[in-house]
Amino acid sequence: MVKKFDFLVIGSGIAGMSYALKVADKGKVALVCKTTLEDANTFFAQGGIASVTNELVDNFDKHIEDTMIAGDWISDREAVEKVVREAPSQIQALIDWGVDFDRNENGEFDLHREGGHSEFRILHHADNTGAEIQESLIKAVRKHPNITIFDHHFAIEILTQHHLGVEVTRQTPDIECYGAYVLDIETNEVHTFLSKVTLMATGGCGAVYKTTTNPLVATGDGIAMVYRAKGTVKDMEFIQFHPTALYNPGDRPSFLITEAMRGYGGILRTKDGKEFMQKYDPRLSLAPRDIVARAIDNEMKHRGDDHVYLDVTHKDPEETKRHFPNIYEKCLSLGIDITKDYIPVAPAAHYLCGGIKVDLNAASSIHRLYAVGECSCTGLHGGNRLASNSLIEAVVYADAAAKHSLAHFEEYSYKDEIPEWNDEGTKMNEEMVLISQDAKEVQQIMSTYVGIVRTNLRLKRAWNRLDLLYEETEELFKQSVVSRELCELRNIINVGYLIMRQAMERKESRGLHYNIDHPKSEA
């Protein structure tokens, strides 16, 4: 079946929904979501959203400098300036949509400070800021008459000239996006969504790794689709591992112990109770995430331990419960009282700094296709993301994409000659074990060889293993009736390959990419 919309939005986190709300007054919007609107990475963001609001002590230049330092000086300066300077107006847009940020008794924002920030500038809603934003946007989206929500729909491929029989290569200068083939997971039908403009907002790819704080839907779908359509993908080697995910084997996703807990005064300790951050960085537990994650990884490998501890037992118990109610309840459910007991933590794949390369308008290298949020690479994060810069990047670039696409979408027409999905000659896959086992294998390969610390030999081994899985999976895809599980396996193999290949191409240790065989560049 063919469905036509002015705007096709693939993904329903803060990026996809804020874009949808900004364009919906001017045209019909399809919001495609592979599970439900609640199941986005945004929902899991605890810490907050960074913006200069207290101008008595803070200013844009400080936020810009902090971002450049965190990014190891390879962030795109224009992107950094754009996000920092436009942040306050986008915070207001969120408030207008119903987001309730915590305030102090004077009615001013109650600001947190997190690792890498020189000032208190993190707006938050207790310790579940992402959930507050997601729920507010869901309400606004559901109310809008021009937005049609397609939940349990999974985008398989974006449509380009390739689907009209034209040969498209990475050198083709004018690739255009005409929409997407989308699988209705409940009926197993593939629909052709034709659009004037498409926005990719599919989030990150934490599910490529064995341990991740991301929801299980974070399989890098948008990045894989755009790469297969010959779009440009950049900086995939920069994977941020959150240093402190709650250590609870079998939890997937891993429960996040927010950065704000270290900003609050939490101390990292080894299993025998000794502090260790003084060996690694003068900022101790408040050092940037990559330094803390490598320090914890090193302590664990050196000692043969499977976790370290985060200690807030020296803080006022009532204050701890007030600041971190969710963390307190979660730990208590596991028999850990954080006001008296140390919290067991270990690093987990958390955030992708790279993705679909976009310009200042959030436009990708494929015409009529924009990308916003974690699936995009704006250049803001460079080699490493500054804490709480991602939610604000998503709304700033969603705004840019909305303005640019609204200025141009009426110039475009639907490509009615795109053929419908053809699955002749395919059969139902009777062997789901092939897919589930291969997915586990990808996660094991990535965690072992392309994790926090890398070497040339590990990366080469990952290449060889992924190459074999790629060949087998492509063969299975051609023969089988399409399914969400098979598409996700294909996507994590594509994304794993991109992370590994771009890691091999970077002949230095920089930001989050740490290769023992290539010492840190002094440049």
Show which residues each predicted segment covers:
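An anion/pyrophosphate-binding glycine-rich loop and adjacent beta-alpha core
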Residues: 37, 225, 231-338, 343, ...
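Rossmann-like flavin
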Residues: 70-110
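FAD-site-proximal beta/loop scaffold in flavoenzymes
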Residues: 157-169, 173-174, 178-187, 336-380
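Short beta-strand to alpha-helix junction loop
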Residues: 75-88, 121-139, 150, 212-220, ...
